[in-house]
Amino acid sequence: MKIAFLGDSITFGYGLERKEDGYASLICRQMGVEEANFGITGTLMARAGMNREDGRSFLDRLYLLKDAGFAVIFGGTNDYFWSDRPIGNKDSGEDHFAGAVDAICRNIVDMLGTGKVLLVTPYRHNGIGNFYGGRHFEESNRHDTDQKNFHGHCLEEYVDILVQVAGDYNIPVLNLHEQQGFDWKIHTLDGCHPNEEGHKWLAGQIGQSITARAD
C-alpha cells in the first residue's frame, strides 16, 4: 500500500537533518508501506497569499493523491499565518479558507471515498506570520496561535472549519489542536516546526489514526 501525505513544511520535514526522521517516513517504516510525501514549505490550503497563482496550494496539488491507497491531508497553519484573505465561508470561493476546505473535501471524496482519507488539523504553537499585516518572516511578527491574525482570526477558528466541513463529507479528522502532550517549547525547533521528538509525537498520533482506518 502507498500512503500519500499532502502538506506544508511540517510534512516536508523542514529543519530536520534527515528527512527520514519526519513523521510521514516514521509512519510508513513502522507500517511497512510506501511513502509519497507531497509536503511543500509555505503552502496554503487555499489559493491565497503566495499560492494564489503559483499552483502550489493544496487545492492545486490534490490530484497527486489519486493513486494513493490512503491519503493524509495536514494543513491550515499557513492559511492562519499567511493568507491575504479572511476565512470566509464555504460559498466564499477557493481563495478563502472555508471555500477551499469545502472544495478539497468534496474532491477528495470523489477521488478516494471517505474510508481512505484522514484530515489532520494544526496543533497549538508559536510562529511567525502576518499578525501585523506583514509579508516577511520577521521576529516582530511572532505570536501564539491563540492570538488573532491580521484578519481577526485565531488558529482555532481554522481548526473549527476543518472539523465542521470534513464532518459534512464524513471525512475522519484528527484534531491535533485538542490533543494533549504537544508542547512547542519542547517539540519544535523554532516554535512551529517539529524537531525529531515532535515528529515522533506526530507519527504516534497520526499513525494510530491511520492504522484504525486503513485496510
Q: Which residues does each predicted region cover?
A:
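Generic structural signal for well-ordered alpha-helices
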Residues: 101-105, 159
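Catalytic His-Asp segment of secreted/periplasmic serine-dependent ester chemistry enzymes
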Residues: 83, 122-215
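Conserved SGNH/GDSL esterase-like catalytic core that processes O-acyl groups on lipids
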Residues: 2-4, 12-99
